Amino acid sequence: MAEQTQLAPAAFHLPDLVAIQRNSFRWFLEEGLIEELESFSPITDYTGKLELHFLGKQYKLKRPKYDVDEAKRRDGTYSVQMYVPTRLINKETGEIKEQEVFIGDLPLMTDRGTFIINGAERVIVNQIVRSPGVYYKSERDKNGRLTHNASLIPNRGAWLKFETDKNGLVWVRIDKTRKLSAQVLLKALGLSDNEIYDKLRHPEYYQKTIDKEGQFSEDEALMELYRKLRPGEPPTVSGGQQLLESRFFDPKRYDLGRVGRYKLNKKLGLNVADTVRTLTSEDILAAIDYLINLELDLGGCEVDDIDHLGNRRVRSVGELLQNQVRVGLNRLERIIRERMTVSDSDSLSPASLVNPKPLVAAIKEFFGSSQLSQFMDQTNPLAELTHKRRLSALGPGGLTRERAGFAVRDIHPSHYGRICPIETPEGPNAGLIGSLATHARVNDYGFIETPFWRVEEGRVRKDLAPVYMTADQEDDLRVAPGDVATDDAGYILGTTIPVRYRQDFTTTTPERVDYVALSPVQIISVATSLIPFLEHDDANRALMGSNMQRQAVPLLRPERPLVGTGLEPQAARDSGMVITSPVDGTISYVDATHIEVTADTGEKYGYALQKYQRSNQDTCLNQRPIVFEGDRVQRGQVIADGSATEKGELALGQNILVAYMPWEGYNYEDAILISERLVYDDVYTSIHIEKFEIEARQTKLGPEEITREIPNVGEDALRQLDENGIIRVGAWVESGDILVGKVTPKGESDQPPEEKLLRAIFGEKARDVRDNSLRVPNGEKGRVVDVRLFTREQGDELPPGANMVVRVYVAQKRKIQVGDKMAGRHGNKGIISRILPCEDMPYLPDGTPLDIVLNPLGVPSRMNVGQVFECMLGWAGQLLDARFKVTPFDEMYGAEASRLTVNAKLSEAREQTGQPWVFSDDEPGKIQVYDGRTGEPFDRPVTVGRAYMLKLVHLVDDKIHARSTGPYSLVTQQPLGGKAQQGGQRFGEMEVWALEAYGAAYILQELLTVKSDDMQGRNEALNAIVKGKAIPRPGTPESFKVLMRELQSLCLDIAVYKASTEDYEEDKEVDLMADVNQRRTPSRPTYESMSVGDIDDDDD
C-alpha cells in the first residue's frame, strides 16, 4: 500500500493510555504504603510499657522470586516481599530492640499495568465513587413545602446529617439514627451560645430551635446525646463525651481524607489545614450556617448535584490497595497487642510479635476475589487497553445494579472530555460502567481532568501548554468544542460560537470564549475514537460498534484498515502487544523469536518474542518482527507486531469488497452472505488455543497414576501417547482422543456383576483400576502445541492432594463458517447465513466478484450512515492505492466535509483508473452489478465499496451442541442446561402452549415424561429403543412427585388414585414410597434387560 493520506491533521498526540494504572501503583509504593505503615505506628500494649514502632519510610522490597513469564508458567503470583524496620521499646527498662521484619508479599504491577495472580493476568478496574465532603439537597415534604438537608460524608466513619423541618427547626442525625436537636450537638461540642451566634449569619433562625427545645448546658447536652444514641443504657456525661470523641474526633475511627477536607474547605469557605482529617466544631457550625442560608434562600448558596463529576472521584489501584492494606494492618495490630500482653516482655522480639498472615490474607483476598479485580479481557489489544481504562461505579463502597436509578446512569454535562458518553455495556450495567475519555487524566485528589487551549480575545493560544481542568473549575467558564474553525493565526472564525457554560449549551461571540477543547476526539474513549465517520452514526449503534471492536478475534493475517482515524498506532503501542525500540540505534540481530537492538552508545537490548501463547480468552498471542538486520530504528519505533496489529497499527479485521443489496433472502434480518474466497484464502481464519488440564491425586485407595497402561483401550487409541501416557507435541487430535492416560484405583464395591463373576470363576485378580483419562471434548479438534508437566519433585507448587499436574495446549485453525458472527465498526452486526461459490457471487463490471453482500435495509432505520461513507472512501482508497485517516467530527473543514471528501476521492479514482463506471455523477457511489449465476445486470445500480469487517469471538463452534443422554439434576431429575453441562434444550411453558395449540398429545406426553424426569419411564424407553421394541407407557414425572412431597410436608394428605369404576378404588397411581430401581445411578440411564411380557404391545 502507498503512504497514507491525511484528510485531517492528526489529533493532538494522545497521552499514555495506561498511565492511570501505572501512576496509581507508583503512588502506592512511594506514598500510600508508607502512609498506612506510619499511621498505625506506634502500637502500645494495654499497660503502656511496651511500644512497637514501624519505620515505614525505610521499608524495603526484595526482588521477585519469579519474573513475569515464569510466574505465568508456574501458576505463581508475580510479587515482591515487603520488609519493614521495626523498633521495640521497653519503657520500664529503656531497652530498645531493632529488627527488620517480613510483613507479607505484595503483587507487583507489570509494565503493562496488569497483575499476575496465580498464573492468570488480572486488571484492577478503576472505581468511581461519591467524593467525601458535604452535600446539600432539597426535598419537598407531603404538603409541598421545600425543606433542605445536608449530609457530611467522610472517607470512613459515621455520617452526619443536618435537616430542617416545617417549623423552621434544625435537627441532626448521626449515622441515620434518631434525630436530635442541632443545639444538643453544638453544646455537646463545648460551644457557648455567644460562639454559636457569632459564627451564624442568621442566628434568629437558630434561635427558634432553642425556644422550642429550651436551653441545654454542656453536660445536659452530652447526657441527651448519649440517651439518643444508646437508648436503654443509663446516660452519663463521660459516656457522652467518649461517644462523641470516638465517633468524630478519633483519627482511627473517623477520616475525611485529603479529598474530604479539600471539598469541605472549598464548599464552606473554611481555612482548616489539610492535615486535619477529622471533623472540627468549626466545620459543623459552618455546615449549619450554610444550611440556614439555603433555607432562607438568600443567594450565594446552592444545592449540590451528586452526579456532577466534581462530586465523584476515581479510586484507582493504589488507593484500593491502600484501603486493603489498612484492613490487614488493623487485624495485625490486634494480634500484636495480644501477643505483647501474653508473652514475657524480656524474651519478646519484633519478629516474634509480627505475624505476616493477616496482611497477606487481606491482599490476597483483594486480588483474588474483589469485584474490582477482574480476569483481563485479552481477546485483542483494544480489549486489553479498554479494560485498564474502565471506570466502574460498582464494587465495595459503590453502588449495586439494583439500587442504581436513572440519574446515576445518565450522561451528565460534566462528563464532557472526562468519561465517554458512548462506550458503556448494554443491559443491567448500562451507565454504571464507563470508559475514560482519550485525553482525560486523574489528578492527585482523584478528580478527572481534561485539557483545553486558552483563548485570548478570540485567538486560540496553541503555542501555550494546554490547561487541565476539573469539572468544578470548568463550570463557570465558556468552553467551545474542539472542532471550531480557526484561521492560520488561531483566531476563531464566525460570529456565533457554540459553548458550554454552567452545564448548559449556549452560543456566544468569539471574544467571550474562555477556552477551546483540545481535540474533537477528546470527548470519546479510545475504542469509540477508532470509528471513522463517527459523527454520522446514531449513538446507540456507535455504542455497539465500540463494544464489538473489543470482541474482534485476531486473524491469521492482520490487515490495517484502509479508512482509519489516525489513532490506531497509539492504541496498538499502549496496549503493550507490540514491541518498541527503547533507544535510537541499529538492529544487530533478528529471527522469529528474538530481536537485538544495539544503541548508538553501544549498549545492547535483547527482546524475546511471544510465540503462539494462549490468551485469557483462548485467542492466540503471537509476535512477529517487522524489521531486518542492519535497519536503523528510532526510540519508540515499533520493531515487532503483536496479534491483531500490522506495521505497528491496530488491525482487528479485513478490508473486503461489500455491496448493499438483497440476495435471494439470504441477508434477511441482518444475515450476511459471503463468498467462498474468504474461506479458501484464509481471510477470516483465526487461531484458538485451548488448555486441557488433569491432575493425578492421592485417593483413599492409593495414588492415581498417569500411564499408557489403560484398561479396555486398544493400541490404536494409544499410538500418539509417549511412554508416560502423555500425548506428544505435534499430534493431531479429534474429539474422544486420549490426551493424557490416567487410571484411578477402584475398590471392591465399584465392580460390576460380570467382573465379580469372572473373578469367582477364574480366581484371577483383574487390575483394580478405572480409566479416568483426559480426552478431547465433543466437537473439538486440533494440534497439540505444548505439553507442560508439574510435579512436586521439580519444586512446583501444586494444589493440595495432587501429585502431578499435566497441561496440554491444543491449537485449532478456525475458518469462517455459517453461524459465525461478523460486524463492522458502526454497530452493523450479523450472522453468516450462506457461503456462496465465487462464481455465483454478484460481480462488478470488470468481473471482480464481491466478497460479502449486506442488507441495505440495515442502514436507514438504524441511522448508522458512517458505514456507507467508510465503504465508499475505502473503495477510492483501494483504487488509488492509498490509506486514509479521518478524524471524527470534520465539520471544522467546512459544511458537509465528509460527503465532499468522499466524492472528491471517488472522482480522483475515476480519473486515475480511466474507468467511468467507478464513479457515476448521476448515481454517486452506486455501481451496476451483474448476477454471477446468469450474467444479467441487476435492476438497479447498488452501493459497492471496501468496508472493514471484523470476525467476532462469538463463534458457532463454541456454541453448537447436541445431547442424546446425559446428566440429570439431582432434585428435579430433569436434564441440566447449557453446553458445559452437556445439557438439554429447555422446552418451556410457552413452547408447551404452542404444542397444545396443535393438539400434539403424544409429543407433549413424551416431552413431559420420558424425555424429561420420569425416571422409570426413561430407563424403560431407552431399553426398548436399544432392543428395537415398542416404547412402553410413560409413568409419573419426578417433578410431580416433588410437588406432592412438598404438599405432604405441609401436612396435606394428598395422593393420586386410579379411577376404575364409579366408586373409586383405593388403587394408588403414584406411590411415593416405591423405589424405582434399587441399583440406579442417578446421573445416567441404566440398561436393564426386560422380558417381552413387560412390554404391552396393545398399549400403543
UniProtKB/Swiss-Prot annotation:
The keyword Protein biosynthesis does not apply. PROSITE patterns: RNA_POL_BETA (PS01166). Keywords: DNA-directed RNA polymerase, Nucleotidyltransferase, Transcription, Transferase. InterPro entries: DNA-dir_RNA_pol_bsu_ext_1_sf, DNA-dir_RNA_pol_bsu_external_1, DNA-dir_RNA_pol_su2, DNA-dir_RNAP_su2_dom, DNA-dir_RNAP_su2_hyb_sf, RNA_pol_bsu_bac, RNA_pol_bsu_CS, RNA_pol_bsu_protrusion. GO terms for molecular function: DNA binding; DNA-directed RNA polymerase activity; ribonucleoside binding. Signal peptide: none annotated. Its EC number is 2.7.7.6. Residues 1064-1100 are annotated as: Disordered. GO terms for cellular component: DNA-directed RNA polymerase complex. DNA-dependent RNA polymerase catalyzes the transcription of DNA into RNA using the four ribonucleoside triphosphates as substrates. NCBIfam families: PRK00405.1, rpoB. In cyanobacteria the RNAP catalytic core is composed of 2 alpha, 1 beta, 1 beta', 1 gamma and 1 omega subunit. When a sigma factor is associated with the core the holoenzyme is formed, which can initiate transcription. Belongs to the RNA polymerase beta chain family. This is DNA-directed RNA polymerase subunit beta. The gene is rpoB.
